[in-house]
């Protein structure tokens, strides 16, 4: 399983660990085990987490590779309280993930020339081969889960904003053949539901078929159970729809969403918290040298700045 744009909150909760969640720095690995009945042997689930901003998306090449692709579920974590970053984050990471998957498939074709067709078949089995929206869908070739976090903050937002965000995420999830789940670390019921969803993908436990699409409540939409008719039109007036030049429905929804929530670029390393200053990575001897070096740099910069005053 591969989480992108995540922090350790989710693995700490999922594995019932008694520790404080910490921000994920770049790419991190952890694992969990689950007992198999009365057997001594346990199932092992491998989890990679990518954090630190969209500019690190190239690191997904490590966990997503030809040897792991057939056993990988992609989990995209989106912050519901930050809609002005949501589309940019989602689009950047999904584009990178799809490109990496295509690259892996090219390598895998050397051993199995029909690997892409097999993955397509599995994708449609997840969504439903007879789904009425089939001609409008473009499911990911590996299982995809989209988790909207900070529902506790989101539920206090303006109702119109919540409606736009929920409809848009339902549309994107539906087109990509993803399961959609809203989550809050402060609500035990949502923790339990998210834990069940992750357990299904990690250990093949029974999946919940509960469908919740009311924008006033936390969304829970299993892959293939939504429909374009139920989602409705993008949040644009009929007059605006006629003026928008979009190549496909996804672009139309992008125009609608970004018109409502102008996007901020999160692809800047400068906006990411410096892990070197994080207490969890403290190294006294190295930190002392770093302080000395920073002091020298500051002194030099100060002198250069005031040289011609």
Region locations from a protein language model:
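TRAFAC-class small GTPase G-domain
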Residues: 1-179, 184-193, 198, 270-280, ...
């Amino acid at each position: 399983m591969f989480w992108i744009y995540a922090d350790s909150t989710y693995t700490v909760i999922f594995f019932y660990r008694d520790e404080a969640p910490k921000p994920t720095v770049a790419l991190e690995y952890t694992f969990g085990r689950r007992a198999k009945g009365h057997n001594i042997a346990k199932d092992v689930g491998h989890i990679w987490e990518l954090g630190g901003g969209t500019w690190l998306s190239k690191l997904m090449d490590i966990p997503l590779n030809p040897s792991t692709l057939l056993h990988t579920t992609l989990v995209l974590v989106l912050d519901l309280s930050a809609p002005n970053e949501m589309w940019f984050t989602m689009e950047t990471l999904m584009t990178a993930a799809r490109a990496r998957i295509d690259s892996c498939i090219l390598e895998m074709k050397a051993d199995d020339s029909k690997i892409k067709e097999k993955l397509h078949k599995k994708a449609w089995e997840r969504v439903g081969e007879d789904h009425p929206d089939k001609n409008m869908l473009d499911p990911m070739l590996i299982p995809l889960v989209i988790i909207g976090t900070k529902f506790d903050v989101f539920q206090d937002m303006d109702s119109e904003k919540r409606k736009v965000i929920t409809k848009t995420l339902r549309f994107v999830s539906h087109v990509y053949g993803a399961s959609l789940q809203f989550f809050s670390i402060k609500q035990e019921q949502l923790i339990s539901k998210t834990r069940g969803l992750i357990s299904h993908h990690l250990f093949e436990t029974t999946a919940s078929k509960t469908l919740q699409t009311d924008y006033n409540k936390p969304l829970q939409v299993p892959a293939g159970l939504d429909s374009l008719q139920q989602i409705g039109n993008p949040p644009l007036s009929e007059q605006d729809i006629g003026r928008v030049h979009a190549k496909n429905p996804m672009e139309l929804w992008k125009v609608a969403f970004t018109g409502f929530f102008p996007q901020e670029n999160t692809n800047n390393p400068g906006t990411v918290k410096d892990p070197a200053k994080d207490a969890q990575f403290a190294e006294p001897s190295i930190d002392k040298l770093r302080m000395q070096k920073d002091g020298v740099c500051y002194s030099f910069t100060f002198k250069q700045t005031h040289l011609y005053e």
